[in-house]
UniProtKB/Swiss-Prot annotation:
Biological role: Has lost the two conserved residues (Ser and His) proposed to be part of the active site. Therefore it could be inactive.
Subunit structure: Component of the chloroplastic Clp protease core complex.
Protein's name according to its UniProt entry: Putative ATP-dependent Clp protease proteolytic subunit-like
Domain of life: Eukaryota
Family statement drawn from the similarity comment of this UniProt entry: Belongs to the peptidase S14 family.
GO CC annotations on file: cyanelle; endopeptidase Clp complex
InterPro entries: ClpP, ClpP/crotonase-like_dom_sf, ClpP/TepA
Organism from which the protein derives: Cyanophora paradoxa
GO biological process: protein quality control for misfolded or incompletely synthesized proteins
Taxonomic lineage of the native organism: Eukaryota, Glaucocystophyceae, Cyanophoraceae, Cyanophora
Disulfide bonds listed in the record: none
Length: 199
């Protein structure tokens, strides 16, 4: 059963009480929470949040929390490019899982400001085709070439963000590969682990 969207209570200087969706309240604090999304419309919402925060103040960092497994690369390239284009520092934090293309988003954060909680998992995998493939042999050949081109792009992007050699990344993409938070740090997805502050 869905839990719905929690509301946050706020009071202005005139003691007028209003309620905001929790995502809107977090956005006011420059916090974005990435969960699974399924189409380009969802991706555009996250891109819009980043562009809005950039226009509000390009000097203040944005905290980008990730608990997501995005399967199809074409649904994250726009978000990835936006993260790298804006001037504000993007602090990426994995809590739970950064799976599939979400691991690339995690690695896209500002160097030195990419984190994971101790029990987080990071997973990288070979790109998949959105919606499956059908049609004539020529159509299949076109899709196969696109898939190989996408894989090459991913290898280059992971290389840029993690520093791992391209042959290592190509081998690691052949099957889903899971990393503990510590292993993700050693691989180059993140820079540090965030340890519990309450002991």
């Amino acid at each position: 059963m869905p839990i719905g969207y929690p509301l946050v209570k706020a009071m202005d200087k005139d003691r007028f009480i209003s309620y905001f969706l929790i995502n809107n309240a977090l956005l006011n604090e420059r916090v974005i929470f990435l969960c699974n999304y399924e189409d380009a419309t969802d991706e555009s919402i996250y891109i819009g949040m980043l562009l809005y925060l950039e226009s509000e103040n390009s000097q203040k960092p944005v905290s980008f929390y990730i608990n997501s497994s995005i399967t199809f690369p074409n649904l994250c390239f726009g978000l990835y490019d936006t993260i790298l284009q804006i001037k504000a520092d993007i602090v990426t934090i994995c809590l739970g899982l950064a799976g599939g293309m979400s691991s690339l988003i995690l690695a896209a954060g500002t160097k030195g400001q990419r984190f994971a909680l101790p029990n987080s998992r990071i997973m990288m995998q070979e790109p998949l085709i959105d919606g499956g493939v059908n049609g004539q042999a020529t159509d299949l050949a076109i899709e196969a070439k696109e898939l190989m081109d996408t894989k090459e792009i991913l290898i280059n992007l992971y290389h840029e963000r993690t520093g791992q050699p391209k042959p290592v990344i190509e081998k690691d993409l052949q099957r889903p590969r899971y990393f503990s938070a510590q292993a993700a740090k050693e691989y180059g997805f993140i820079d540090s682990l965030l340890m519990a502050s309450n002991g």
